[in-house]
C-alpha cells in the first residue's frame, strides 16, 4: 500500500504554453474584472505563474494571489452566513479553493517557526474538508508536537484513528508527553509489531537515505521510516521519548 507524501501544489494542472495562457487570462480579466473573484480563475492564474518560473515568482506574484483567496473566502462565507459549512473535495466545484488554500499552507510550511496564521489556515482547511484529501493533518500534527501543544496533537490523531503510521506514532508521542504512559506503551507495542521499520529508524543514531519517490511512499516501508525519522526524531529526543521507546518496545 502506498500513500502520498504531501500535497504538491499545482500537480493536477498544467499548460503547454504558460506565457500565452497568462496573456489570455490577463486580457480576459481586463475585460471582466469580476473574474478576479473566481477561485477557478485564480487557481489557473497561480498554476500558470508557477509554470513560468516556480522559484522566482512564488513570493512576489503568487503569494499576493493566495492571500486574496483567504480574504475572498471569508467574504463569501460571511455573505452567505456559511462560516460553519464544509467544502469537501468530493465535489469538483470546491476543489479550486481547496487547492489554493493548500498551496498557501505549503508556503507557510517552509518557515522554520509556525506563525499563528499558519495554524489557523491548517485548522480552517480541516474544518472545511474533514476527510483531508490534501494531507494537512500531518504537518499540523507535527507543528503541534513541535510547539508542545500535546492535547491538540492527541485530539487530532484521535479524529483519524485508523490513519497512516505517521499519525499513529504521533499519537504515541502525544500520549507519552501528556503522561499517559500505559496507553502510550500499549500503542507503541502495537505499532512496533505492525510498522517496525519506523521505530527502528527512529531509534538509530543514523541511517542511509533510501530511494524515495517524490509523490508516494510505501506505508510502513523504508522510505516512510526515513521520512518520519527526519521530521520527528528531534522532537522525540527533546521530550525524552527515544530512550523510553527503546526500553518499552522490546
Where are the model-predicted features located?
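Residue register within tetratricopeptide repeats
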Residues: 19, 23-26, 36, 60, ...
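A structural/positional concept
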Residues: 26-57, 61
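Hydrophobic/aromatic side-chain positions at a characteristic register within alpha-helices
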Residues: 13, 17, 30-33, 50, ...
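Surface-exposed polar/charged interaction patches
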Residues: 31, 49-52, 72, 79, ...
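Solenoid-like repeat scaffolds
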Residues: 27-34, 123-130, 156-165, 189-198, ...
Amino acid at each position: 500500500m502506498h500513500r502520498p507524501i504531501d500535497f504538491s501544489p499545482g500537480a493536477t494542472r498544467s499548460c503547454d504554453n504558460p506565457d500565452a495562457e497568462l496573456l489570455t487570462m490577463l486580457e480576459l480579466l481586463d475585460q471582466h474584472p469580476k473574474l478576479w473573484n473566481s477561485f477557478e480563475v485564480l487557481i489557473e492564474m497561480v498554476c500558470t505563474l508557477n509554470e513560468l518560473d516556480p522559484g522566482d515568482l512564488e513570493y512576489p506574484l503568487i503569494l499576493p494571489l493566495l492571500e486574496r483567496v483567504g480574504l475572498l473566502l471569508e467574504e463569501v462565507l460571511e455573505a452567505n452566513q456559511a462560516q460553519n459549512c464544509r467544502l469537501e473535495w468530493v465535489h469538483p466545484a470546491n476543489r479550486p479553493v481547496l487547492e489554493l488554500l493548500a498551496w498557501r499552507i505549503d508556503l507557510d510550511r517552509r518557515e522554520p517557526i509556525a506563525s499563528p496564521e499558519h495554524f489557523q489556515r491548517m485548522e480552517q482547511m480541516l474544518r472545511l474538508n474533514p476527510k483531508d484529501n490534501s494531507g494537512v493533518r500531518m504537518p499540523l500534527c507535527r507543528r503541534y508536537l513541535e510547539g508542545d501543544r500535546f492535547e491538540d496533537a492527541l485530539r487530532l490523531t484521535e479524529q483519524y484513528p485508523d490513519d497512516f503510521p505517521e499519525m499513529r506514532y504521533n499519537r504515541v508521542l502525544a500520549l507519552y508527553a501528556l503522561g499517559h504512559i500505559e496507553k502510550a506503551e500499549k500503542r507503541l507495542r502495537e505499532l512496533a509489531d505492525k510498522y517496525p521499520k519506523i521505530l527502528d529508524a527512529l531509534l538509530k543514531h543514523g541511517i542511509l537515505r533510501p530511494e524515495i519517490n517524490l509523490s508516494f511512499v510505501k506505508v510502513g516501508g523504508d522510505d516512510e521510516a526515513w521520512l518520519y525519522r527526519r521530521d520527528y526524531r528531534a522532537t522525540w529526543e527533546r521530550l525524552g521519548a527515544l530512550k523510553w521507546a527503546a526500553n518499552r518496545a522490546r
